[in-house]
A protein has these predicted regions:
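Non-ligating segments of multi-cofactor redox enzymes
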Residues: 2-174
Length: 174
């Protein structure tokens, strides 16, 4: 998901299951989704997927996954979606909210690098960076100013919040 500022998937949802959050993430209320798939049809990036499986109680899964004890290993902050709803990357909204709440409870400012998504946390090369574009001192804001930065399908006008860098090529002639 590109977490667009002008997300075409948000406007077509008949039950308002998709909305735009304060941090710029495109969020879903999974318990509100009725699975019309309009959002998937309207997404120019084709990143939304329909959940065909019944994950909470599926006999195809290992016994331990359907056991009450086995279900306790799942992340309690992430909703286990039921069959018949649309799914997409949430940009780890639960981790973003936890970071904000923890800083608020401690009375601290949120510093650059405190926000982490699962993919950026797992990326050992540092190729994935997550942060606040409004903080001019942040690493992600500096990367945003780089001439090599681009957005996918910019001409569509969705104003995505996910950025990419062009591959570095040696342009010096011998």
């Amino acid at each position: 998901c590109q977490h667009c500022n002008h997300a075409p998937c948000e406007t077509v949802c008949p039950v308002a299951a998709t909305s735009h959050g304060r941090q710029g993430q495109n969020q879903m209320a999974y318990n509100r989704c009725v699975g019309t798939r309009y959002c998937a049809n309207n997404c120019p990036y084709k990143v939304r997927r329909f959940n065909w499986f019944n994950y909470p109680n599926n006999s195809e899964f290992d016994f331990n996954m359907n056991d009450d004890l086995g279900k306790m290993v799942l992340n309690p902050d992430v909703t286990v979606r039921s069959r018949g709803v649309m799914e997409k990357c949430s940009m780890c909204i639960q981790m973003t909210q936890k970071t904000i709440l923890d800083a608020k409870l401690k009375g601290e400012e949120i510093e650059d690098g405190m926000f982490q998504t699962a993919c950026s946390n797992a990326c050992t090369t540092g190729a994935m960076v997550f942060g606040d574009l409004n903080d001019k001192k942040s690493k992600v804001a500096a990367l945003h100013q780089d001439d090599r930065m681009y957005h996918l399908l910019e001409h569509v006008g969705t104003k995505p919040n996910v950025m990419y860098h062009v591959k570095v090529r040696n342009t010096d002639e011998v």
